[in-house]
């Protein structure tokens, strides 16, 4: 709504116009005079100013509304409320329909009321303000809303009875408590019935003293205001009497009214259904009940609104029944019903000033219309409306209107009394007084009383002016008053005045009771509001606390969840850390285990290495020990030999001296005997001399056929040292007693292998070798004579140094042809026996005296020379012709028996013979080294010699290597040659040692050559024939270089090939065999390469294939033990690696620098550098056709082919 201050008060309706009572009805009342009147500009200006002031007051009042009222109306204390919202309350019925009580307010409807009508024309502005208002044709219905600026009566000013517009709907921001049902909100918004019941209850609850206090307060307030107003007024008797009359009238009215109220309350308590009777018994009016809209007003605010008009039925039923507005309300008023309409409007306006005052029935309402004429009735109601207007403004204007009204009434009463007493009728005195007091002029209110009066007062006086000026006959108030007085009797006028006082008193009392009730309701509502606020605050606090608790719970829950998550995370991290720690520990454990295993392996390897080193050192120590022992033994042997030589030398010196003495004595005795002895004795002596010479010089003994080659030693196999010169003294032979040979075993390295001759024997002084008689002839075996063949005699070596010309001075044994002259290298033709089988073969000289140029008819060439092999022993048929032979080789028939390959156990010493045996029996004994020719020794001397030899035998049994043996140990014998220097294999061809001077050939014999048992070759015959300079292949089918036998020159231009001694021991031999077996397996298995491993069993089989037939079988353990030895230049070099796997043990040979030199010693394997192509006629160094490994050159089979 727009601000009331900004708009002017609308003009009043002219005659024939009526304001619309509400939004639904536009009642038009017929006007008695439609003539326009002039506008009083002064009053209009005053009305405008009053409207502006009223608007400002309303706005100021609306800004100071108490908290409970503002809460009830939905307005804030500071918000300026419109007059519409200040004039009504809300009431929500059960069905939710908003109920608005009709409220009559003194405010003006500024912009929402329907436009005024002028002469039936809508929208026409009324330009006159002094024209008399007509009554409106229709009163407000029950439930209709009228604006505050429209009057409910035609005689009331528009400011008094303003129609009220329909308020807007409830806003959505109102408190929730305002939207509750009426039952729950009874303390805030109550219906009319509930309000009446509450007021009645409040009045009944008051005590008598409180009720009198209320009435007294009203009376005192009115009197006090009146005294204050009359303080500066006239103090004449008339005015004094008037004041007294007013006081008395008020006291009477209030007392009587209170009595009537008390009587009515006592008599009619509980006798009504919808509410208490609002009017006491006839003539008595009690304070009417206010509508709910009036309960929101406080003292000093707006006018109390007027609710519905209720009427009491004739049968005294409840006065709360709403006035029936259906009869003649909806129809517009017509001219025919003017009177009725005017009467009805007057009645409605009359009862409107009492604000819900009711009368005893319609008849009483219509009574005034019948009693008074129409103009008088209008005037009365005009005055009544003015009185009510003053009553409504009492609290706002400090009761000034009421006081003025009372003064007027008092003046009228005094006038009536004077008229009664003096018979003077002056109607105009009733209004303005009659004691020289001029009537109230409108100008008195212009400036002085503007703040105390509102527009309603202006309307009142305006109405008065209108009534006096144009609405009544006579044109002024005096005429109207006279007319009224003329029309009414004095009693009626008094009764009407009293009734007016009663109405006003009831109105004032009603205001006071309602004020008290409102204060109580306000207090209750304030308390309730406080309670509700407290409850709301409590609820809010509880809600906030609940929210806080819920938030705390959520927070705690989130915290717990977070804590649980953190715990879960920590647990997972702990588990992960534990797993990592376990994995790390496991890894550490594995690493530690691996380290431990590596350490163990390292320690094991270290232990193995240490063990191997210790074993190597042990073996080395053993080897050194053996070498040391060997050297010691050799030194001991040499020492013994030197001692023996010295001893022999001494004995020889003694023997020479003895022989000289004996010779001298013998010569003397012989001379004497010759002189004295007969001639027969001389012949017998001559007969004995050749026998003694044979025994002492040559020592002819039967020799076995198999050992003839060992007994007939060539000169180049003897020691290179010069023999001790011993003069040859012819002596008579001294036969010795035959002696049983000793059955003790003799070692080749033992001193017992020396000849046991009683004469000093030839001893080699070489540190490395021994004489062939000590090696090959050391073991003598008693052989049997067979076929009656004459034995071949052993030719002893001369004691003196060999001379190149010594062969010329020597005699030849029987059956041997003499040698050629020295230096020519020519030999005589062998005897015919070589060509004829009936003669035994005879060889030429055993050795040419010229070193390096042997005689062709001397010793035969080595096997394999000139393409033929030597005749094996015992062969009785000649060789096939050809093969380079000039003629058949005559076999040596049964001349030499085959010798077994074993060692003989016969003693090597010459047994003594008795004097009784025949000299021929001596051939049955093994031949021994021939002793120098000397005089036969005596028996005693022979015994001394045997004792000395026995001492030497005992010494050899306890010294040397035999000293290391236990008494129960049996000396180990081997077919292979021992590792002693100078030792040769028994049964092989005797040859020179490496230190010998027997003319070692530059071209050694082939390793595959088979040595015969007797060194007689086919190189006999013509000495001047061509010879093969280098030798021939050992095989018969191989081509030869040169002619066959029969030539006079030797097969070898540089001397016969000497045999190398087999100096290796069995471990060295086995190691060399294993090396060669590995090499052959590498060549046979090229996929494995030269450094591959071979199974030990395969290697053992290969070694067995390479092993000589006369070598004992080699075991696997022995071979593996030999493989552990370190290699050097003697055993083939290199090293062996042995590994073990699931298939077994494997061995690999790893060569080094020593293995290369040892693999080519005197032999070249086919396929190597320097080896000849197979079946080629070109000779190679070391022999042609050598197919056996070089290891086989160290030893040879002692047998034949």
From Swiss-Prot:
Keywords: Coiled coil, Cytoplasm, Stress response. Residues 40-50, 130-141 have a biased composition (Basic residues). The keyword Transmembrane does not apply. Belongs to the NST1 family. Residues 313-341, 441-466 have a biased composition (Acidic residues). Residues 84-114, 535-553, 563-692 have a biased composition (Basic and acidic residues). Its main location: cytoplasm. May act as a negative regulator of salt tolerance. This is Stress response protein nst1. GO terms for cellular component: cytoplasm. The lineage of its organism: Eukaryota, Fungi, Dikarya, Ascomycota, Pezizomycotina. Signal peptide: none annotated. Residues 116-128, 145-164, 293-302, 740-767 have a biased composition (Polar residues). It is found in: Cytoplasm. Residues 769-805, 926-938 have a biased composition (Low complexity). Residues 520-673 form a coiled coil. Residues 1-178, 268-341, 429-478, 535-707, 724-848, 899-952, 1150-1169 are annotated as: Disordered.
């Amino acid at each position: 709504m727009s601000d009331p201050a900004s708009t002017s008060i609308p003009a009043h309706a002219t005659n024939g116009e009526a304001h619309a009572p509400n939004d639904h009805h536009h009642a038009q009342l017929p006007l008695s005079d439609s003539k326009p009147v002039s506008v009083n500009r002064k009053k209009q200006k005053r009305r405008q100013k009053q409207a502006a002031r009223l608007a400002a007051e309303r706005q100021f009042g609306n800004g100071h509304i108490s908290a409970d009222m503002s809460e009830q109306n939905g307005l804030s204390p500071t918000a300026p409320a419109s007059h519409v919202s200040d004039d009504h309350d809300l009431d929500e019925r059960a069905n939710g329909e908003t109920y608005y009580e009709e409220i009559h307010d003194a405010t003006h409807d500024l912009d929402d009321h329907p436009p005024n009508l002028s002469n039936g024309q809508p929208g026409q502005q009324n330009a006159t303000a002094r024209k008399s208002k007509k009554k409106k044709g229709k009163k407000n219905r029950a439930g209709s809303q009228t604006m505050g600026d429209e009057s409910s009566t035609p005689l009331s000013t528009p400011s008094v009875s303003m129609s009220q517009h329909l308020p807007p709907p409830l806003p959505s921001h109102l408190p929730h408590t305002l939207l509750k049902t009426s039952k729950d909100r009874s303390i805030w918004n109550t219906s009319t019935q509930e309000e009446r019941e509450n007021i009645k209850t409040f009045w009944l609850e008051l005590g008598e003293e409180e009720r009198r206090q209320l009435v007294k307060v009203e009376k005192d307030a009115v009197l006090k205001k009146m005294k204050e107003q009359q303080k500066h007024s006239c103090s004449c008797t008339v005015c004094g009497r008037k004041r007294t009359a007013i006081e008395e009238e008020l006291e009477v009215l209030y007392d009587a009214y209170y009595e009537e109220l008390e009587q009515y309350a006592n008599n009619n308590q509980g006798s009504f259904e919808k509410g208490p009777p609002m009017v006491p018994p006839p003539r008595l009016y009690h304070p009417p009940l206010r509508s709910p809209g009036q309960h929101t007003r406080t003292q000093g605010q707006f006018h109390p609104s007027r609710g519905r008009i209720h009427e009491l039925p004739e049968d005294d039923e409840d006065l709360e029944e709403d006035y029936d507005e259906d009869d003649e309300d909806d129809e517009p008023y017509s001219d025919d019903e003017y009177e009725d309409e005017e009467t009805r409007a007057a009645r409605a306006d009359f009862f409107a000033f009492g604000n819900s005052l009711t009368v005893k029935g319609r008849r009483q309402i219509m009574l005034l219309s019948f009693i008074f004429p129409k103009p008088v009735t209008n005037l009365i109601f005009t005055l009544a409306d003015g009185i009510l207007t003053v009553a409504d403004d009492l609290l706002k204007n400090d009761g000034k209107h009421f006081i003025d009204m009372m003064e007027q009434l008092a003046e009228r009463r005094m006038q009536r009394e004077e008229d009664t007493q003096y018979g003077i009728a002056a109607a105009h005195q009733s209004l303005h007084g009659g004691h020289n007091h001029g009537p109230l002029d409108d100008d008195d209110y212009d400036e002085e009383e503007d703040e105390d009066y509102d527009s309603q007062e202006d309307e009142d006086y305006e109405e008065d002016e209108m009534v006096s000026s144009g609405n009544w006959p006579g044109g002024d108030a005096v005429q109207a008053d006279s007319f009224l007085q003329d029309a009414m009797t004095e009693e009626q006028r008094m009764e009407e005045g009293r009734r007016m006082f009663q109405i006003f008193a009831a109105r004032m009392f009603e205001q006071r009771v309602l004020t008290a009730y409102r204060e109580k309701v306000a207090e209750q509502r304030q308390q309730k509001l406080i309670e509700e606020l407290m409850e709301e605050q409590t609820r809010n606090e509880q809600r906030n606390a609940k929210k806080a608790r819920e938030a705390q719970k959520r927070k705690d829950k989130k915290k717990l969840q977070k804590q649980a998550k953190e715990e879960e995370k920590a647990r997972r991290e702990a588990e992960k850390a534990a797993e990592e720690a376990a994995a790390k520990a496991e890894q550490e454990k594995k690493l530690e285990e691996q380290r431990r295993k590596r350490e163990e392996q390292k320690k094991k390897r270290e232990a193995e290495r240490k063990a191997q080193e210790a074993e190597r050192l042990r073996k080395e120590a053993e080897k050194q020990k053996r070498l040391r022992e060997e050297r010691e033994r050799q030194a001991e042997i040499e020492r013994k030999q030197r001692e023996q030589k010295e001893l022999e030398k001494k004995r020889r010196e003694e023997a020479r001296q003895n022989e000289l003495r004996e010779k001298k004595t013998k010569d003397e005795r012989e001379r004497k005997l010759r002189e004295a002895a007969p001639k027969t004795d001389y012949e017998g002596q001559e007969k004995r001399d050749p026998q003694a010479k044979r025994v002492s010089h040559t020592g002819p003994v039967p020799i076995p056929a198999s050992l003839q080659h060992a007994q007939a030693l060539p000169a180049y196999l003897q020691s290179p040292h010069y023999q001790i010169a011993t003069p040859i003294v012819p002596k008579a032979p001294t036969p010795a007693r035959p002696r049983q040979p000793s059955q003790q075993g003799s070692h080749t390295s033992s001193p017992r292998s020396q000849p046991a001759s009683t004469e000093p024997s030839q001893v080699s002084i070489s540190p490395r070798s021994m004489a062939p008689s000590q090696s090959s002839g050391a073991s003598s075996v008693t052989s049997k004579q067979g076929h009656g063949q004459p034995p071949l005699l052993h030719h002893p070596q001369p004691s003196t140094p060999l001379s190149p010309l010594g062969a010329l001075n020597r005699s030849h044994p029987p059956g041997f042809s003499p040698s050629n002259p020295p230096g020519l290298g020519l030999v005589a033709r062998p005897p015919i026996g070589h060509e004829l089988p009936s003669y035994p073969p005879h060889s030429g000289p055993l050795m040419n005296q010229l070193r390096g140029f042997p005689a062709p008819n001397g010793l035969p060439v080595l096997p394999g020379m000139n393409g033929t092999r030597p005749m094996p022993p015992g062969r009785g048929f000649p060789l096939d012709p050809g093969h380079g032979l000039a003629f058949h080789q005559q076999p040596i028939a049964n001349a030499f028996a085959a010798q077994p390959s074993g060692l003989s156990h016969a003693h090597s010493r010459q047994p003594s013979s008795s004097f009784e045996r025949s000299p021929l029996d001596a051939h049955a004994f093994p031949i021994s080294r021939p002793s120098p020719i000397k005089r036969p020794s005596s028996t005693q001397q022979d015994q001394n010699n045997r004792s000395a030899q026995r001492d030497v035998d005992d010494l050899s049994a306890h010294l040397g290597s035999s000293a290391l043996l236990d008494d129960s140990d049996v000396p180990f014998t081997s077919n292979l040659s021992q590792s002693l220097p100078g030792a040769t294999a028994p049964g092989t061809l005797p040859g020179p040692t490496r230190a010998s001077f027997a003319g070692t050939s530059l071209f050694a014999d082939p390793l595959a050559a088979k040595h015969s048992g007797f060194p007689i070759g086919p190189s006999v015959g013509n000495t001047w024939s061509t010879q093969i300079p280098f030798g021939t292949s050992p095989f018969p089918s191989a081509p030869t270089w040169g002619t066959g036998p029969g030539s006079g020159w030797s097969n070898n231009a540089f001397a016969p090939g000497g045999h190398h001694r087999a100096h290796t021991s069995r471990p060295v031999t086995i190691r060399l065999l294993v090396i060669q077996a590995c090499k052959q397996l590498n060549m046979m298995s090229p996929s494995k390469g030269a450094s591959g491993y071979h199974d030990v069993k395969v290697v053992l089989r290969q070694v067995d294939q390479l092993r000589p037939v006369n070598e004992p079988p080699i075991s696997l353990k022995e071979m593996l033990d030999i493989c552990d030895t370190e290699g050097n230049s003697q055993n083939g070099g290199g090293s062996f690696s042995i590994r073990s796997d699931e298939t077994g043990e494997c061995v690999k040979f790893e060569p080094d620098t020593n293995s290369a030199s040892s693999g080519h010693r005197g032999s070249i394997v086919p396929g190597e550098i320097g080896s000849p192509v197979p079946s080629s006629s070109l000779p190679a160094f070391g022999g042609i056709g050598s197919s056996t490994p070089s290891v086989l050159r160290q030893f040879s089979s002692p047998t034949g082919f």
